Amino acid sequence: LDIYGARIEITTTEPCFAAPIAGLADDSDISDCIIKDTYVSLTDSAKMWGTGGIAGFGSGNLDNITTDVTLVCVDTDAAVRDEQFMGGAYAAGFLNIRNCSITIDGYDSDHGYVHDGGLVGMYMVYPLELSKTYQGEVLNNKVKGMITFFEDNTDRRAYCQANMGEVMNWTYAYSGFTSDFKRNETYDYSVTLLPEMCSNPSYSDTVTEATAADFGYTTHTCSTCGYT
């Protein structure tokens, strides 16, 4: 399965996980995919929510997947101390990740607790009984990119790492991880963080024609800021 140029934009007040393949992955196997030039944006005011580059929340296996995704989380209720998750592979849960190449451009504006990771926002095994015996695998993965975020909260967590934002259960084999990742925290809480920050963007279009082996696509480039 290859996904090119998907655009997912969700606005809700309910708990929600958004991702290109599965918002909820329940003991799911996802393998040998390419997810390219894909944009996932979730605007929410719920207590728990997030975005992922492959899957949202859950369990299972991710193998041999290449991604190039833009992820956006916008928290719209400053009074709620929410738990927000963003991950280049998945937002939260305990999926195994093996031989995956993740490119992430993340933007997270949150007034609660941030859990952001180049691979996983938060690694957590559930239910509790399973967490006592479960042995997972996070092997031979690479991450490239940046997550720009703010956490507008005096009781701060601000979890953001190249691999996993927060780890609740250290119950997995881990090796072969490489990264070229930037943790970019900002402190102007009045400005919602988005990939396109121009108030009046001006776009030029470049068409790449389809071939027998590849899909065609159009690249839109802002002449003001260079965003594509």
Place the predicted regions along the sequence by residue.
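Predominantly extracellular/luminal carbohydrate-interaction, adhesion, and secreted-enzyme modules
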Residues: 1-197
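Extracellular modular ligand-binding repeats in secreted and cell-surface proteins
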Residues: 196-228
